[in-house]
Amino acid sequence: MTKDELIARLRSLGEQLNRDVSLTGTKEELALRVAELKEELDDTDETAGQDTPLSRENVLTGHENEVGSAQPDTVILDTSELVTVVALVKLHTDALHATRDEPVAFVLPGTAFRVSAGVAAEMTERGLARMQ
């Protein structure tokens, strides 16, 4: 899609969600915003007309922003399990440098870094990174 087409799509999605949407940024940022709004619209379509009962799962407790440890199955103890990807957009991620075992928090477009195979698959599916 061209940048103009992305802006038109953002306007349309913003109207459907009944909210203002930022129309500025790079083509990649606009494409990411379109994907996020589509996902949000899909979520609202699935729950439209349904009464959501209050349960333990959907009630705020005040502890939502507390930091917890990673799930045991997501902790990678062996770096040979990591795959290398190249960022297509600027990312804030929990990864390792492509060649050194150093943590990386921010990745710029074109930068290679290592993550688990599952995270790499999700990033490539969302157009955030490509496999190297």
From Swiss-Prot:
GO terms for biological process: viral genome packaging. Its main location: host cell. GO terms for cellular component: host cell cytoplasm. Residues 81-132 are annotated as: Capsid binding. It is found in: Host cytoplasm. Keywords: Host cytoplasm, Viral genome packaging, Viral release from host cell. It holds the Pfam family Packaging_FI. The keyword 4Fe-4S does not apply. InterPro entries: Packaging_FI, Packaging_FI_C. The keyword Cytoplasm does not apply. Stimulates the interaction of procapsid with the terminase-DNA complex, thereby increasing the overall rate of DNA packaging. Before packaging, it likely coats the surface of the procapsid through binding mediated by C-terminal domain. FI presumably dissociates from the capsid once it inflates upon DNA packaging, and is not present in the mature virion. Interacts with major capsid protein via c-terminus. This is DNA-packaging protein FI.
